[in-house]
Amino acid sequence: MAPKIKYTREEMIETGINIIKESGIENLTARSLAKRLSISTQPIFTCFGSMEEFQAEIYEYVEILFHEKTQAGLKANTPFLGYGKAYIQFAREEPELYRLLFIDNKKQGYLKVMKDAQDLIRPSLQKIYHIDAKSADFYYSNMWLVVHGIASLIVTECCPYTDKQIGEIMMGFSLSICQSIKTIPGFVDNNYDGYTLYKKMIGE
């Protein structure tokens, strides 16, 4: 007869996430989870089969949490700037969870997180900025580099910028990319003469 399980899967996942928040994914083991719950490791493997399965469910839960937090930023007047600020705020408030999603993930699950976020944001970008889907995806991928770079600096405690400066940096990049999409033919397809445009811009 199988032993009675004292904790539900959800409670084990919640406890696992708390361990990650406190000391990182590298310290989430069957033994550390069992110790926190004051149980043996057997109920954990009864519920999940393996730590790989357990960690996969934790990753999925954290991804959902990330999307919930960042999607709220789309309610701002400028959707991607609101999203970007929420993205950075998530990194600031939950650095270990951010590491789990985007830095320490060896299976490149962050690519799925990026794609899911892109799918969520695309309609808002098209509606607010009056651009087609391809241009919206181009805008997103370029702005993601900026936002992810800032968030990574914050998580690694290397960010030299104030919140005001971060907002100004994001606005500057956003305006530049959006303007280029709208005014430079072939920009989205990388089918334009950048060298000639630069010479014209600097007055040569």
Give a label for each model feature.
Residues 1-8:
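Short, Lys/Arg-enriched anionic-surface-contact patches
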Residues 105-130, 137-145, 168-179:
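Amphipathic alpha-helical packing segments from all-alpha helical-bundle domains
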Residues 100-108, 159, 192-194:
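Short linear capping/connector segments at secondary-structure termini
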Residues 11-18, 53-75, 82, 86-89, ...:
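Alpha-helical structural segments
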Residues 11, 15, 19-53:
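Helix-turn-helix
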Residues 123, 127, 156, 160-204:
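C-terminal peripheral helix-coil segments that are non-catalytic and often amphipathic
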Residues 80-103, 109-114, 144-147, 151:
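Helical hydrophobic small-molecule/effector-binding pocket
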